[in-house]
């Protein structure tokens, strides 16, 4: 049985400003997404009977509610294909960590199955379908670091520096709904007028609320903050700090390992998923 194995990379919100709240309850954001060379891995095998089967169950997530299954079925339905797939997940990224695990898995599923099912779908169409699954899915479908506006779906490619990061993973899952509904959340940051998007003098507007409500996150920020500027990604719980070399990042993580769990990863403006897909295209055309 031939299988297609692809990564589902993590992302960081290098900063995140909330500039308003819409009538439908969603928040207007401005943020910069950058990928990490670290993530989940998914394997896909073609089925002729139309069945979508995820062989790796995730605790507390019913099979039919999993974003991987939902993405596969939505693509199947909208494309009209009679084909199905067996799917296996190697889960590395934490749930509720703010590094995009579920959204990235969904995007990898869309791109993988469009390839396996030989669908004539371009990136725009896959990204639009991805948006119906979650606001962060389109950036993973497109695979380029981006300045995002709206609810996070209006994407402009950017190329920030690509440092090494220490990412700490507090052993707590932060509820995005809880954070975005919190009365003390800043919702009136001024929209950016500058282009290109500045990299300095920024923040994550969710961070004060998360720090206040999740002491594990506050402790991680304080620990990493002794070595570099530490910041929350997304609504958390993961926090990150940048370093100029892998050696320095590894050293800091080792110093924190007695009290913190985390990993070191390279920032990347082109996702490792897209680099892998590009290599597959080159092989098939060679």
Swiss-Prot record:
ATP binds at residues 94-104. It comes from the Bacteria. One of its GO terms (molecular function) is 4-(cytidine 5'-diphospho)-2-C-methyl-D-erythritol kinase activity. GO terms for biological process: isopentenyl diphosphate biosynthetic process, methylerythritol 4-phosphate pathway; terpenoid biosynthetic process. It holds the Pfam family GHMP_kinases_C. SUPFAM superfamilies: GHMP Kinase, C-terminal domain, Ribosomal protein S5 domain 2-like. Pathway: Isoprenoid biosynthesis; isopentenyl diphosphate biosynthesis via DXP pathway; isopentenyl diphosphate from 1-deoxy-D-xylulose 5-phosphate: step 3/6. The keyword Nucleotide-binding applies. It is an enzyme of class 2 (transferase). Its EC number is 2.7.1.148. The active site is at 11, 136. Belongs to the GHMP kinase family. IspE subfamily. NCBIfam families: ispE (TIGR00154). Catalyzes the phosphorylation of the position 2 hydroxy group of 4-diphosphocytidyl-2C-methyl-D-erythritol. This is 4-diphosphocytidyl-2-C-methyl-D-erythritol kinase. It comes from Pseudomonas putida (strain GB-1).
């Amino acid at each position: 049985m031939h299988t297609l194995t692809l990564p589902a990379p993590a992302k960081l919100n290098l900063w995140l400003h909330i500039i308003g709240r819409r009538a439908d309850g969603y928040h207007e954001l401005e943020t910069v997404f950058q990928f990490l060379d670290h993530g989940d891995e998914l394997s896909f095998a073609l089925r002729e009977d139309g069945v979508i089967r995820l062989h790796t169950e995730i605790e507390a997530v019913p099979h039919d509610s999993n974003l991987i299954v939902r993405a596969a079925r939505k693509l199947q339905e909208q494309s009209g294909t009679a084909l199905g797939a067996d799917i296996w997940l190697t889960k590395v990224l934490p749930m509720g960590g703010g590094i995009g695990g579920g959204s990235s898995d969904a995007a990898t599923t869309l791109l993988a199955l469009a390839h396996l099912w030989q669908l004539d779908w371009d990136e725009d169409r896959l990204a639009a379908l991805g948006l119906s699954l979650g606001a962060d899915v389109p950036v993973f479908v497109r695979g380029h670091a981006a300045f995002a506006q709206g609810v996070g779906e209006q994407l402009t490619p950017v190329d920030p520096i690509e440092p090494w990061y220490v990412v700490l993973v507090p052993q707590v899952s932060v509820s995005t709904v809880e954070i975005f509904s919190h009365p003390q959340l800043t919702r009136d940051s001024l929209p950016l007028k500058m282009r290109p998007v500045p990299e300095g003098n920024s923040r994550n507007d969710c961070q004060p609320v998360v720090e206040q409500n999740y002491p594990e996150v506050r402790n991680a920020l304080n620990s990493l903050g002794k070595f570099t500027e530490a910041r929350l990604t997304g609504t958390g719980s993961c926090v990150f700090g940048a370093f100029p070399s892998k050696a320095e990042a590894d050293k800091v993580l080792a110093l924190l390992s007695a009290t913190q769990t985390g990993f070191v990863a390279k920032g990347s403006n082109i996702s490792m998923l897209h680099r892998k897909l590009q290599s597959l295209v080159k092989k098939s055309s060679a």
